[in-house]
UniProtKB/Swiss-Prot annotation:
PANTHER family: EUKARYOTIC TRANSLATION INITIATION FACTOR 3 SUBUNIT 7, EUKARYOTIC TRANSLATION INITIATION FACTOR 3 SUBUNIT D
Compositional bias segments (type: Gly residues): 110-130
Annotated transmembrane regions: none
Name of the protein this chain belongs to: Eukaryotic translation initiation factor 3 subunit D
Top-level taxon of origin: Eukaryota
A GO BP annotation: formation of cytoplasmic translation initiation complex
Length: 585
């Protein structure tokens, strides 16, 4: 080896004031950004295209810091010392978000338009009956985990999709058309009605009419599969006379037994008004110091609605040419449910003249000389309730005609129990408007609690009215039948799947039904009518109509001429007489 001089070594030294090998300034390795990493870093995804951007999360600053703060590429957990220094424009390059996200897109992410029914408070939603509202991007309780529903019958809402623009809208018609000579006196929304309260009176029995057959307890047993009993159409004479035409109430009014008079079906609608969705109307007649709560001939109050409170309730279709659609409209379902309730109460009793229970007086509406059909099992109990307040100068009493359908032996001994017999009906658990109901044939006895809870949600107003009627009549128990179509495509044949019994007070507690609120509504309406007529002549007849708005949670009070609806009743009577004459010929 040739010797090297000191001068050569000095000349080979670098000119900078550093020691060691030269440090390269380029942080690119074959055109790819490079950064040191730690073996202790948690492994993550190489790429995630399903995560939402920062601008989509509106859950607050805390969630933002948790999910997005200091999120870098793989190896970023070591220190900020190793952050990549961008040497050129990389605006199209996105760093990987390694936070845990769900790969399923849900309807709430896009803020979809959700149609909701009254009272169905979905998670993270507010809103009233039959309204459209925007659901924000994950603003609900817990965000997407409540909206990520894997069931098609979730009832928390749905996103409008293919051809939803062509689907019928829920714009309902009023139960009665407002005429030009009517004067609106007051409009009250349901929020104000829900705040009223009056201590619920117990009531006392004044008299009773009619008779009752004993309930057939074999219907309480679970039916054998594929051997359910068919619902029979029985011809029996049953009456539902309005208040002012009741001869017993007329007699009690002449004796000044009370100031206000009503029937349980009319009164229950008024007491449960905040739960109602469809339109209804009540006629109020004020004559002298007496107030009568009446109903029109063929009023909607007499019909039994189906899934009125469901989030996706049945709707009327403009073109009902299809049979399947026409039998599942609200009007068709109401007629079907009314038919079922009438016949179910008749079929579930044992018609025996030897064992029937007779009340103090015979049926006040039955005329054996004119009627050809046998009389149905029905008991009428006229009961008086004290609605007085401490500041009232005179007591305010109300007489209500209540009804019971059957009687049953007390299982523990004692007096017989009076029953209210009603029926819930299933039309098609898979059809639109079913409200996410379970299949009764397979779930009624294995998941009875879930079935009843769903019915409480979808038919809140109907069950509340029945429970109120049972409490007004001081009935000992309620029998709820579950009736389904033999074929979902036909509304003419039905089968009885089972019967469940409840005590009215306990059932009211399960439904969160407050009778004090109902009595408060009644007392408020009575006070309003009396205040309007305070300066009128005592003998003058004043008539009012209370109407529930078909599309808003509002009731309106109208002043109408005294002869309103009388011409309609006369025309209806003429048509009935003409039809009877034609049938006799």
């Amino acid at each position: 080896m040739a010797p090297m001089s000191i001068a050569d070594l000095v000349a080979a030294l670098p000119a900078e004031d550093t020691w060691g090998p030269a440090t390269p300034s380029d942080n690119m390795l074959d055109g790819v950004p490079y950064a040191p990493f730690s073996k202790g870093d948690k492994l993550g995804r190489m790429a995630d295209w399903t995560g939402d951007g920062k601008d989509r999360d509106r859950s607050g600053r805390q969630a933002y810091n948790r999910n997005y703060r200091d999120q870098q590429v793989y190896g970023a957990g070591t220190s900020s010392l190793f952050n990549i220094q961008v040497a050129e424009d990389e605006s199209s390059f996105s760093v990987v978000d390694n936070t845990r996200t769900s790969t399923k897109r849900t309807f709430a992410r896009g803020g979809g338009t959700v149609f909701r029914g009254r009272g169905q408070r979905g998670v993270g939603q507010r809103g009233g009956r039959a309204g459209f509202q925007r659901v924000g991007a994950g603003r609900g309780q817990g965000g997407d985990r409540y909206y990520d529903n894997r069931s098609a019958r979730s009832n928390r809402g749905r996103r409008f999709g293919w051809k939803d623009y062509d689907k019928p809208q829920r714009t309902r018609e009023p139960s009665v058309n407002v005429r030009p000579d009517w004067t609106m006196l007051e409009e009250v929304d349901f929020n104000r009605l829900s705040k009223l309260n009056l201590e619920a009176p117990e009531g006392e029995d004044l008299d009773s009419y009619g008779f009752l057959y004993y309930y057939d307890r074999s219907y309480d047993k679970a039916p054998v599969k594929n051997a359910e009993r068919k619902l029979q159409a029985l011809e029996r004479a049953a009456y539902n006379v309005t208040t002012s035409q009741d001869p017993v109430i007329q007699e009690l009014a002449e004796k000044n037994e009370a100031t206000v008079f009503a029937t349980s079906d009319i009164l229950s609608m008024l007491m449960c008004a905040p739960r109602s969705v469809y339109s209804w109307d009540i006629v109020i007649v004020h004559q002298g110091d007496k107030i009568y709560f009446d109903k029109r001939e063929g009023a909607s109050i007499d019909l039994v609605t189906v899934n009125e409170n469901a989030a996706d309730a049945p709707v009327e279709t403009a073109d009902s040419s299809g049979k399947q659609e026409s039998i599942n409209t609200p009007s068709a379902l109401a007629l079907e449910a009314t038919f079922i309730n009438h016949n179910f109460a008749l079929q579930t009793v044992v018609e025996s003249e030897e064992s029937k229970v007779t009340f103090n007086h015979p049926n006040p509406f039955y005329n054996a000389a004119e009627e050809t059909e046998p009389l149905a099992s029905k008991g009428y109990k006229y009961r008086r309730f004290d609605l007085s307040l401490q500041d009232d100068e005179e007591p305010l009493n109300m007489i209500v005609r209540t009804e019971v359908d059957a009687v049953m032996k007390n299982p523990v001994g004692g007096e017989d129990q009076h029953l209210i017999v009603k029926a819930l009906n299933e039309f098609d658990s898979k059809a639109p408007g079913s409200g996410g109901a379970l299949d009764w044939r397979s779930k009624l006895w294995s998941q009875r609690g879930a079935v009843v809870a769903t019915e409480m949600k979808n038919n809140s107003i109907k069950l509340a009215r029945w429970t109120t009627q049972a409490i007004l009549a001081k009935a000992d128990a309620m029998k709820l039948g579950f009736v389904s179509r033999a074929n979902p495509r036909s509304a003419t044949s039905h089968v009885i799947l089972g019967v469940v019994g409840y005590k009215p007070r306990e059932f009211a507690a399960q439904m969160n039904l407050n009778l004090g609120n109902g009595w408060g509504i009644v007392r408020t309406i009575v006070d309003r009518i009396r205040a309007l007529d305070a300066e009128e002549e005592e003998d003058k007849v004043k008539k009012y109509v209370l109407i529930k708005d078909p599309n808003r949670p509002v009731i309106r009070l109208y002043s109408v001429p005294p002869n309103t609806f009388e011409e309609d009743d006369e025309a209806a009577e003429e048509q009935e007489e003409k039809a009877e004459d034609e049938s006799e010929e």
